[in-house]
A protein has these predicted regions:
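Glycine-rich phosphate/adenosyl-contacting loop at the front of the ribokinase-like
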Residues: 1-29, 36-43, 99
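Residue-level marker for the onset of beta-strands and adjacent loop->beta junctions
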Residues: 15, 62-65
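Ribokinase/PfkB-type carbohydrate-kinase core domain
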Residues: 31, 39-57, 64, 69-200
Length: 200
């Protein structure tokens, strides 16, 4: 039996919370549903001065992830909700200006909301050399499930990839970049060299 439970808002919320705390005007463009989980999200956004500009769904609650932690390891059980039920128009509300940062979380790279990300990229970001705002992409461990078409479009807009070593290795595998494990135990060894090749 669990000693305690602690409901909290996850996903990209921590990034938005940090941005808001340093005084940046912060907006959330994801779909929010209707129900207890959606209410938790709306309250967290409101409490942190984050404006929700995305769509609302009244026929489904937002999804949740259950994290079971026994102090030695964590087990994740996830169910997707309203946030995954977007379409190609989902992110039409996003109009980045000069100097803005657009943060794309992994949850939007799958299911129906992925078409909204792809439409946004084609509408605003097709030429990274002339774009006057930044795209930060946090793929998490779902990168292996992103469609080939969307992954290609993401690579072409040259975002800032925010990922750990495991996620970077998955990205390298998807892009056919060889990771040299023979020097991986040395400081600045094979893995770091491979990641440099991946970035190039």
């Amino acid at each position: 039996a669990a000693n305690h439970t602690m409901p909290s808002v996850g996903g990209s919320f921590r990034v938005m919370q940090a941005a808001s705390r340093i005084g940046a005007a912060t907006k959330h463009a994801g779909v929010i549903g209707n129900g207890p989980w959606a209410s938790l999200i709306r309250k967290a956004l409101n409490d942190n001065g984050i404006e929700h500009i995305g769509q609302d769904r009244i026929d489904a609650d937002s999804g949740f992830r259950l994290v079971l932690n026994d102090s030695e390891r964590k087990t994740f059980v996830a169910t997707y909700g309203a946030e995954s039920q977007g379409n190609e128009n989902t992110f039409d509300c996003v109009e980045p200006g000069e100097g803005d940062v657009v943060h794309i979380s992994a949850n939007t790279l799958m299911d129906h909301s992925a078409s909204g990300i792809d439409a946004f990229l084609h509408r605003t970001s097709s030429d990274p050399t002339t774009r006057d705002y930044s795209i930060v992409l946090n793929p998490t461990n779902t990168l292996h499930m992103v469609s080939d078409h969307l992954l290609e479009d993401l690579v072409l807009v040259r975002p800032i990839w925010s990922c750990n070593r495991q996620e970077a290795r998955t990205l390298a595998d998807r892009l056919g970049v060889f990771v040299d494990d023979s020097l991986s135990m040395t400081v600045g060894g094979g893995f770091d060299d491979s990641m440099k090749a991946l970035c190039n």
